[in-house]
Amino acid sequence: MNQLHDAVDSTNLPLGPPIRGKVRDCYRLPGGRHGDAMLIVSTDRISAFDWILPTLIPDKGRVLTAISAFWFDLFSRGSDPVPHHLITTDVDDMDLPAGIDRGPLRGRTMLVRRAEVIPFECVVRGWLAGSALAEYRASGTVCGEPLPAGLVAGGRLPAPIFTPATKAASGHDENVSYAVMAERIGDARAAVLRGQSIDVYSRGAAHAAGRGIVVADTKFEWGRMADGSVILVDEVLTPDSSRFWPAATAGSGRVPDSFDKQFVRDWLEASGWDKSSPPPELPADVVAKTRDKYLDACRLLTGSLPAGVA
């Protein structure tokens, strides 16, 4: 575990080479009492514009894990539970080899069922912002689908829309039409993913609204199990995967400030960085404010901060 000033940059557990994403280090754990499982460790790395930034955000990995675990639990309840991959976030209940220091893993680690990830980001938008706003202003469409005239920046859409993107292992995810997605994975599977994604978004947005947060948009990932069933995987409704706005300022005719990494994107845009060369270090005040935004999102959505975080 590589830690810099209490922030975790990367992990090197004796579990074989990890699969490193932009934020997470993943290890396969086959053959334990939980079956074919994966260990997902959320580091404090942050990415923007398809680059991993050189600066860490302390406690970010704990926030992502706490929020995802909250949603997985919430969506498991009721008469229509959402199947998902999370087994536990309790490191003492994980079948790890003797000698592994579990301390640095606490609060930032999920043990999950292994699934074949379907290679599309399932994006759901309820409000107009980001690349959707730019496309709408240019053509009146989002991902090629026409929208009513007269929508404003940061405005609510008539209904949530599904706008998939190709999922890249590294590099740039590309927005595609629903028709392209259906052609690649089949009409039936595409329809299931669209319906389930909009349903989970709507349920999450309703909970967030009761906590004073608007979920402007988010992205989900789904995985296929050996029996053909589809389950919710990766992270869910976090500040990395979503735009969270204060409800009090949403719908004012401009895109509000947010509880997510848009603050970092905005700073990078204003810094003069060309997005084709390695990104600059984030200043200390940007790091501190970003951390505060993530903690605020966690506190508002879940009612508490991650264990051990003040």
What are these regions (language model features)?
Residues 124, 215-236:
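Conserved metal-phosphate-binding beta-hairpin within the catalytic cores
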Residues 48-51, 174-185, 272-278:
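A short small-residue
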Residues 185-216:
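A long amphipathic alpha-helix within ATP-dependent nucleotide-binding catalytic cores
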Residues 113-115, 210-218, 223-225, 291:
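Short, active-site-adjacent segments that bind or coordinate small-molecule cofactors and metal centers
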Residues 155-187:
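A short mid-domain helix/strand-loop element embedded in enzyme catalytic domains
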Residues 2-165, 275-281, 285-310:
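Active-site loop/lid in soluble adenylation, ligation, and acyl-transfer enzymes
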Residues 35-37, 117-119, 212-215, 227-230:
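Coil-to-beta-strand transition motifs
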Residues 236-297:
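C-terminal helix-cap and adjacent tail motif
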